[in-house]
C-alpha cells in the first residue's frame, strides 16, 4: 500500500486551508488513531494493512468535508481513481469511502452510523483533536476565520438535533464548547480513545 500517494493527494487538496482542517490535522489524526489502535491491539503490526487503512482514512477525511470542500462528489471520484494506484482492494476502497463520508460529527447528529473498526479509531482520533490545547486552538481559529464572536451572552447554546441546524445556526466559539466539544468524551468508540478523551476533557 502506497500511503505516500494519499499524503500527496491530501497536501494538494488542503493546500492553503487555515481553519484547523489542514494536512497536519490529518497527520495528527493518523498518528493518534494508529497509536490508539496499537494500544488496544498490542499484537498487531505497525505495518499491517489495517494500520495503512487507518492512516489513509485519517489523511483523506477532510478532503471531502463540506465545510472546506466546494465539490465533495468530485473529490470522491478522484479518491476512487487514486486508491487502486495505492494498492487498495475494491473492498478496502468501499470501506474507506463509507467511513470518510459518514464519520463526521454532523453526519451523525440525526442518525448514528456504525463504522468498521478502522473508522472507529479514525473518528475517535478526529474528535480527540477537538479536545485539549490543540482543540482549543482549532476552535478559536475556525471561529475567527468564519467571523464568529468569541462570546455573546445574548446568544445561548443550542441542543443540536439536525445537520442543517448545526451548519446554519448562529453560534459563538464559547458556545461551540457547550454544544459539541464537552460532549465528545461520551461519543468515543474504542477503549484507548475513551481514556484519552477523558484525560483531555478533564
Language-model features, listed with the residues they occupy:
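Short alpha-helical hairpin
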Residues: 1-11
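Divalent metal-dependent phosphate-bond-processing catalytic cores, especially two-metal-ion Mg2+/Mn2+ enzymes
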Residues: 14-23, 27, 31-46, 60, ...
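An active-site-proximal "capping" alpha-helix that borders the catalytic cofactor pocket
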Residues: 29, 73-85
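His-Asp-centered metal-binding catalytic motifs of divalent-metal-dependent phosphohydrolases/nucleases
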Residues: 47-69, 75, 97-106
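Hydrophobic, well-structured mid-protein blocks that either form specific transmembrane helices
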Residues: 89-123
